């Protein structure tokens, strides 16, 4: 991944201890997995909004939260609806979407919010090591360089062959 989000002054957003991640499927699933796996190390509260559970959404304090809205197309209906429910003119928002004419980009510009370009060659379910997963990881207080090292490890042919062999052995043992 490239740190396309580093051009945004992230320091001003690190003060938030409550962060809403709004998106669907792969746009937030990788970040949700990172948060679930490393929750004991993370001192912030992350809320993953990917459906229309209005009771949960309505109970969130809109003033003291950072909203991170993620949609590759920028036109995902559920993401748009949830964003409109959770945002207000004074809320702090960061949008990650393709650099194309889309609803969320228009909304971000109208609200004078930060916009980070979602790389158009990365699909949602494969995006955890891109800005879609690494910006939330950074806001969680995690060292994104360690993820970059993991990315290099995954590209290593011998590591992958060993991993596949071990997974196969584990599956065989579980039968």
Regions found by a protein language model. Give the residues of each.
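Low-complexity, highly charged intrinsically disordered N-terminal segments
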Residues: 1-19, 29-30
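Short, flexible, glycine/charge-rich loop motifs used to bind or transfer phosphoryl groups or to couple energy/partner
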Residues: 9-11, 55-59, 173
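Glycine-rich phosphate-binding loops that contact phosphosugars or nucleotide phosphates
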Residues: 16-159
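Acidic catalytic cores of enzymes that act on phosphate-bearing nucleotides/polynucleotides
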Residues: 1-3, 9, 144-148, 156-175
């Amino acid at each position: 991944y490239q740190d396309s989000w580093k051009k945004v002054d992230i320091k001003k957003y690190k003060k938030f201890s409550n962060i809403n991640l709004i998106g669907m499927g792969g746009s937030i699933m990788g970040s949700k997995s990172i948060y679930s796996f490393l929750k004991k190390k993370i001192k912030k509260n992350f809320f993953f909004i990917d459906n229309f559970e209005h009771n949960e959404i309505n109970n969130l304090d809109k003033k003291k939260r950072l909203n991170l809205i993620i949609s590759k197309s920028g036109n995902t209906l559920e993401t748009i609806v949830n964003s409109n429910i959770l945002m207000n003119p004074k809320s702090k928002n960061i949008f990650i979407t393709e650099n194309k004419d889309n609803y969320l980009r228009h909304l971000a510009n109208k609200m004078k919010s930060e916009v980070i370009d979602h790389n158009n060659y990365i699909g949602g379910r494969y995006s955890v090591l891109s800005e879609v997963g690494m910006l939330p990881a950074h806001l969680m207080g995690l060292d994104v360089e360690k993820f970059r090292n993991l990315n290099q490890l995954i590209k290593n042919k011998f590591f992958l062959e060993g991993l596949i062999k071990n997974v196969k052995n584990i599956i065989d043992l579980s039968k």
